[in-house]
């Protein structure tokens, strides 16, 4: 009985820690094809500069698609992109503000999606 209570307590602690991490996206909207849009991801609850940050998206009726990521400054702050967005999308970060950005240029109709940032 004592072991069971300890295990439940540990789960409660871990869930509480997880809930402290917040990633809030902003900047979305409707734009015409060919135009630009910049999304922001404001992070809290962890040391932002220590982590790589990724962007993924989900088009209507489809699964999640990886867009790209930016490494932490400790790993050069370099970026990688999906072939579908390479040359049009740029990911950047401002560690002093705990914000990751997704600059989207030359937008296409197929870029229509809900965009999420992930740690």
UniProtKB/Swiss-Prot annotation:
Disulfide bonds join 41-117. Immunoglobulins are composed of two identical heavy chains and two identical light chains; disulfide-linked. The keyword ATP-binding does not apply. One of its GO terms (molecular function) is antigen binding. V region of the variable domain of immunoglobulin heavy chains that participates in the antigen recognition. Immunoglobulins, also known as antibodies, are membrane-bound or secreted glycoproteins produced by B lymphocytes. In the recognition phase of humoral immunity, the membrane-bound immunoglobulins serve as receptors which, upon binding of a specific antigen, trigger the clonal expansion and differentiation of B lymphocytes into immunoglobulins-secreting plasma cells. This is Immunoglobulin heavy variable 3-49. One of its GO terms (biological process) is immunoglobulin mediated immune response.
């Amino acid at each position: 009985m004592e072991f069971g209570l300890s295990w439940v307590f540990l789960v409660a602690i871990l869930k509480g820690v997880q809930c402290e991490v917040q990633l809030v996206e902003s900047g979305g909207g409707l734009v015409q094809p060919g135009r630009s849009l910049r999304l922001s991801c404001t992070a809290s609850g962890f040391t932002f500069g220590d982590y790589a940050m990724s962007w993924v998206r989900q088009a209507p009726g489809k699964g999640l698609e990886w867009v790209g990521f930016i490494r932490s400054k400790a790993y050069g702050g370099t970026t990688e992109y999906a072939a579908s967005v390479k040359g049009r999308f740029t990911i950047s970060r401002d560690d002093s503000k705990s914000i990751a950005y997704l600059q989207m240029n030359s937008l296409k109709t197929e870029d229509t999606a809900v965009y999420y940032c992930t740690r």
